[in-house]
A protein has these predicted regions:
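Phosphate/dinucleotide-binding and metal-coordinating scaffold of catalytic cores
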Residues: 1-178
Length: 178
């Protein structure tokens, strides 16, 4: 269903800068109900690609996993540990290139995305690379051969090394969900 709407434009208050403007949009209540939004569960995620704005209901970690698996997507579950303690779980939908994190530790230094509770695919890719030997390291090819990896593919390196680094006690497991 497609509808045309007008923006509600007003002046911003509070700590907004001088002459700041706010923009709002009234949405049909049937759409809101169909999305499962309620006064108690009203948080949404906004995505902007330069031309379109997409509004989706914010999913819990379990809902994200279920929706991705139900859609038949390739989903990876990464468990992040500090020593023996499970600190976070990352669900990576490789089909849609979306990611969801469930933080289980209070210390942001033990979390894969720090204080970022809503990482995007690029954040995930950066995290994977951070848990690997740098691409520019001398002797990289010999290292990859020694661990049995054909090329510089962060996820494959992590599968072999558990993403262990000399400077911390963090490590990862990777599981493909069916």
């Amino acid at each position: 269903e497609t509808r045309t709407a007008n923006l509600i434009i007003g002046t911003s208050g509070g700590t907004a800068g001088k002459n700041a403007t706010s923009y709002k949009l009234a949405l049909p209540s049937t759409w809101i109900k169909e999305m499962g939004l309620t006064p108690e569960q009203r948080q949404v995620e906004l995505r902007f690609d330069g031309a379109s704005i997409v509004i989706t209901r914010t999913l819990s970690f379990a809902e994200f996993l279920e929706a991705s698996r139900h859609a038949g997507h390739k989903v990876l579950l990464l468990s992040c540990y500090s020593g023996d303690a499970l600190c976070a779980r990352i669900a990576a939908d490789e089909t849609e290139k979306t990611v969801c994190v469930e933080n289980l530790a209070a210390d942001c230094l033990k979390l894969p995305f720090g204080n970022n509770k809503n990482p995007i695919w690029e954040d995930y890719q950066h995290f994977l690379e951070d848990r690997c030997i740098p691409k520019t390291r001398a002797g990289l090819q010999e290292y990859l051969e020694a661990i049995g990896v054909d090329g510089y593919e962060p996820l494959e390196i992590i599968r072999k090394t558990q993403g262990r680094m000399a400077e911390d006690d963090l490590w990862l497991t990777v599981e493909e969900l069916k």
